[in-house]
Amino acid sequence: MKTIQKTLGIFIILFSMLISPIQAKENSSSNWMENISGDTKLSALSIPGTHDSATQYVSLSPIFQCQDTAIKTQLENGYRYLDIRLVLKNDDLILKHNFAKCRKDKSIFSTSLTLDDVLNDIYTFLDQNPSETVIFCVKKENSKDDLNKVKSILNSKINTNSWYIENRIPTLDEARGKIILATRFKSEYGLYLNWEEQGDRTILDVPHKKEDINVSESLFVQDRFNYGVEDKVQAIEYCLENSMSNDSTFYLKFHIHEW
């Protein structure tokens, strides 16, 4: 599988079984899901993703750039989980990292990257690779934004032929060719993937937070972004050891590299 050079903030989503992309036949990073059985639940896959996925071109890039490739390229390179941070701008949604604006190109005069820009790239990718699916995890980046307005604009973009919007972990066949909506806020549509802030440096015996997706499915998250290297490795190892239990639990693990 291709790697993204000098990529910052990459995280891997580890689910309850480990079925690696390289176990699919050597066709392409663009369609590594093609030869995985369609009755496999997404919680039984190990799926790579990116953190602050839209930050290839971002204001104050030395501080806020987490990726040096576009979302289109990330998908072509095999990543299937996107971390999308949305902010209201008039009657539209744009992408930001904290207060830093994500831009369409590297020019400081470039306009803001919009939700439509990102969705168009994903639609194109899925049209070309119908065996694949993309988890689209949305966070409201500005706490002052009206959540109902954010949801209204987001929901207006949804075409049920192109999106999976149930609050239930799907099988691969249910999700192929579609965007899987996930939100970190309560919504009438999509998987509810929410967790409390985990920046505390305090070492916990069980460094994960369990949340309910629905009455029968759960989310375990390791997002200890303030841990030092040794403690972070311990947290990652714990997640690996405990992510084989069942396919009704999402295991979401953040770790950071630069290479």
Question: What is the predicted function of each stretch?
Answer:
Residues 1-9:
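Bacterial N-terminal signal peptides that target proteins for export
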Residues 182-259:
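C-terminal active-site rim and adjoining tail of enzyme catalytic domains
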Residues 110-157, 161:
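Catalytic cores of phosphodiester-bond-cleaving enzymes
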Residues 24-79, 88-128, 183, 187-193, ...:
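Long, acidic (Asp/Glu-rich), low-complexity accessory segments flanking structured domains
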Residues 9-18:
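Bacterial N-terminal signal peptides
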Residues 155-174:
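Acidic, His- and aromatic-enriched active-site or binding-groove loops in soluble protein domains
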Residues 77-80, 129-135, 160, 176-178, ...:
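Loop/turn elements at helix/coil->beta-strand transitions in domains of secreted/extracellular proteins
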